[in-house]
Amino acid sequence: MNDRLTPELVLSAYCQGCFPMADPETGEISFYEPDPRALIPLDDRFHIPHGLKRALNKKPFELRMDTAFPEVVHACARTDQPEEQWIDGQIEEAYGKLHEMGFAHSVECWDEEGLQGGLYGVALGKAFFGESMFHRKTDASKIALVALVQYLRAHRFLFLDTQWTTPHLLKFGTYEVPAKEYRKLLKRALEEQ
């Protein structure tokens, strides 16, 4: 692992509002602090699209947490678009160590054929930083996201940070806050246990 990307450095970066990504071409690790920052609401503004509600009612997957963390990260790293491969071996190793330390977590969707989708991220205080998601079967990553939101609500988290807004995440009510406001929210979330 690159000496620069220790678990302690990654945690310190999160506490300052930054997160690491590997350059898909060079493998160089850089830290980012988007302005504005995208958050998924954990209150009644969280929206489950109608079609997904139908899928949830069918209960197509068994939901698990932290039973296949390395597999989830590795699946998130595999993408058909090389320009989007920001998760490299250094990232996988650092987050694996964060998982062993109790900071990084996965939400997984399983069926009789195995792991079909999931997501992973980092929990610090009452903040959760969503990193990436994947699916092998329809709606698996979305169902994992809904399960994560339910978990975060039950444990009184203040926010779910998705870093940037995407069309996919907008369907769930994602909103943006200026970096200055984000840092205030982050400070409050880190002070709460």
UniProtKB/Swiss-Prot annotation:
InterPro entries found in the cross-reference section: Acyl_CoA_acyltransferase, Leu/Phe-tRNA_Trfase, Leu/Phe-tRNA_Trfase_C
Location within or outside the cell: Cytoplasm
Annotated GO biological process: protein catabolic process
Keyword list, A-Z: Acyltransferase, Cytoplasm, Transferase
Record-level GO cellular component terms: cytoplasm
E.C. designation(s): 2.3.2.6
Superkingdom of this protein's organism: Bacteria
Catalysis: reaction(s): N-terminal L-lysyl-[protein] + L-leucyl-tRNA(Leu) = N-terminal L-leucyl-L-lysyl-[protein] + tRNA(Leu) + H(+); N-terminal L-arginyl-[protein] + L-leucyl-tRNA(Leu) = N-terminal L-leucyl-L-arginyl-[protein] + tRNA(Leu) + H(+); L-phenylalanyl-tRNA(Phe) + an N-terminal L-alpha-aminoacyl-[protein] = an N-terminal L-phenylalanyl-L-alpha-aminoacyl-[protein] + tRNA(Phe)
Gene Ontology terms for molecular function: leucyl-tRNA--protein transferase activity
NCBIfam families in alphabetical order: aat
Family designation: Belongs to the L/F-transferase family.
PANTHER family per record: LEUCYL/PHENYLALANYL-TRNA--PROTEIN TRANSFERASE, LEUCYL_PHENYLALANYL-TRNA--PROTEIN TRANSFERASE
Its biological purpose: Functions in the N-end rule pathway of protein degradation where it conjugates Leu, Phe and, less efficiently, Met from aminoacyl-tRNAs to the N-termini of proteins containing an N-terminal arginine or lysine.
Annotated protein name in UniProt: Leucyl/phenylalanyl-tRNA--protein transferase
Species name: Akkermansia muciniphila (strain ATCC BAA-835 / DSM 22959 / JCM 33894 / BCRC 81048 / CCUG 64013 / CIP 107961 / Muc)
Name of the coding gene: aat
